[in-house]
Amino acid sequence: FRKKYKNSLNNPDSKKIFNLKNIVSPFILRRTKNEVLTELPEKVENNMIVELSKEQKKLYMAYVKRAKKELRGFNKEENNNLKVLAILTKLRQICNSPQLFDENYTGEVAKIELLREMIPDILENGHRMIIFSQFLGTLEEIREELEKENVEYFYIDGSIKSKERMEISKKFNSGEGQVVLISLKAGGTGLNLTGADVVIHYDPWWNFAVENQASDRAHRIGQKKSVQVIKLITEGTIEEKIIKIQENKRALSENILGKDSGNNKDSKEIFEMDEKELMELLSFEK
């Protein structure tokens, strides 16, 4: 399979991809959410591009320089997965919560500054919201901001038991609270939070299907309003590269399986990259 199709995977118009779709389609019976739940309100997705603060940009560029030195001579055949993942995670931390990367960081954080403007405006217009992040430290920072502004919220991470999650869901959907903060992996499935009509993904994840499942905590049976999904993306950084990987993966899935396809496994593309591809992933483009 890899020998025959791998080089065609990034080209959705490839004849080989068309042939692959014809091969697998007789064995797949799929009914997408859009086909089954035609009565659901609209879901509108938008990427909001955020410029790093001056201090963040300086920190980001310094670490990129260091990371490139560490990866020079990289051989994807060697078991360097943990090293690559650690480097990319640190870059993502700088984009979202620089204090997680450097506890002495005291500069501005672009996304937090944006949230300070967004949240009051969203709530004052009668909306209620879910905010997802993969970093517990980031959720804590957002939590502090909500408390400063006296915003009523619920919080869910992996430590919250199923019974308590269901209780939070019940309270929120009955009108209690204005915001639910959720770690992406803890809240990706099983929760009904149709009391929210705005979903914010504070930091992007490699696999679009995981984010879609999280967004669908609000966009599901019982939702009466259109749902707005907002992804916060720092300009020129690893986050824009993640979005590109998401889009490529989505296009491939849709070409082979059809619209709304995808699985919930984390993307492994980064572990198949060679040194040149990793250097491009690390580059700051603006």
Regions from the PLM with identified roles:
Residues 1, 17-20, 59-63, 168-169, ...:
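A structural signal for short hydrophobic/aromatic patches embedded in well-ordered alpha helices
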Residues 1-33, 223:
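Conserved P-loop NTPase motor "coupling/switch" region that bridges the ATPase
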Residues 19, 23, 27, 59, ...:
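Generic recognition of well-ordered alpha-helical segments
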Residues 35-61, 74-191, 261-262, 268-286:
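Conserved Helicase C-terminal RecA-like lobe
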Residues 37-65, 164, 179-265:
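SF2 helicase/translocase ATPase core recognition
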